[in-house]
Amino acid sequence: VYDIETVSLRYFNVYGERQNIAGAYALVMGIFAHQRLNGEPMTIRGNGEQKRDFTYVGDVVNANILASQSKNVGRGEVINIGNGDNRSINQIADMIGGEKKYVDPVVEPMETLADNSLAKELLGWEPTQKIEDWVPTYKKEIGL
């Protein structure tokens, strides 16, 4: 409208160093870690088979840098920034380890999965970190 170049990056469940472990903006991994550190079972809503695409914060940073420098974007594109694979909430709980407590479900999508082909095509971006490779380091850092 005003000759302003824009691009929107759509992030999928960003995790990484310094993530919130409590409060309204904490993600499931942080919530589980907080519960474990407090000697509580990990609370899973529903059956835990909901799947999410988890994306490492360093990969998100890289996508932002590439988008800011790319000559291939700026016409209002919406680009998914996600790993392109997903894990169930039960799988995340198993990675953290510990007792699980299943409670009533909430209304939410059963699955999110990023189609990151546009990020690859326009930005040359690909994820570098898988959640299952990062969790052991995270557990050591927080003392689990």
Language-model features: where?
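Active-site loop immediately N-terminal to the catalytic Tyr-X3-Lys motif
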Residues: 21-22, 73
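C-terminal substrate-binding subdomain of Rossmann-fold SDR/epimerase-dehydratase oxidoreductases
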Residues: 36-144
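Conserved beta-loop-beta element that borders a ligand/cofactor-binding pocket
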Residues: 1-17, 100
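N-proximal short alpha-helices
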Residues: 2-6, 33, 107-108
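Residues that scaffold the ATP/ADP-binding catalytic core of kinase and kinase-like folds
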Residues: 17-18, 122
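Conserved catalytic-core motifs of eukaryotic protein kinase domains, centered on the activation segment
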Residues: 18-21, 47
